[in-house]
């Protein structure tokens, strides 16, 4: 009886060790997703890169970044007829807010906040988990 119990206990330990090894050695798979709003479209590509398209259909808006956090940055922007595109990359994990300024043709200035939540996986990979883009209260 003791021999059977010992064998079952050893088998259970082996199964637990194998299951833990499989869970801990899973390869990192970045998540891509799209977040759309009334005047923006944000595409997270390969986990740590964000393409932010800001609407300019009426051609009366000029977008610029006025404040950037330490956990992400914009490395380039492109302005076309219908939108302004910002390429944003994650630099570190955490939550950060980037402030965009929109200047309308009539001189009116509106501020918008891009808020990102970034997590770290397997100590080296960054993943953008959530995106929000909202107009700030004046």
Model regions: which residues?
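Extracytoplasmic soluble-region selector
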Residues: 2-7, 19-138
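Core hydrophobic alpha-helical transmembrane segments of single-pass membrane proteins
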Residues: 11-19
């Amino acid at each position: 009886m003791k021999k059977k119990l010992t064998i079952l206990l050893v088998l259970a330990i082996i199964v637990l060790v194998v299951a833990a090894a499989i869970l801990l050695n899973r390869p990192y798979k970045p998540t891509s997703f799209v977040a759309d709003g009334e005047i923006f479209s944000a595409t997270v590509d390969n986990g740590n890169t964000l393409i932010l398209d800001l609407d300019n259909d009426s051609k009366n808006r000029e977008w610029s970044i006025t404040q950037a956090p330490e956990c992400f940055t914009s490395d380039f922007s492109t302005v076309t007829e219908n939108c302004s595109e910002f390429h944003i990359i994650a630099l570190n994990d955490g939550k950060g807010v980037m402030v965009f300024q929109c200047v309308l043709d009539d001189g009116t200035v509106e501020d918008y906040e891009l808020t990102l939540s970034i997590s770290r996986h397997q100590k080296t990979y960054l993943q953008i988990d959530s995106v929000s883009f909202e107009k700030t209260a004046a």
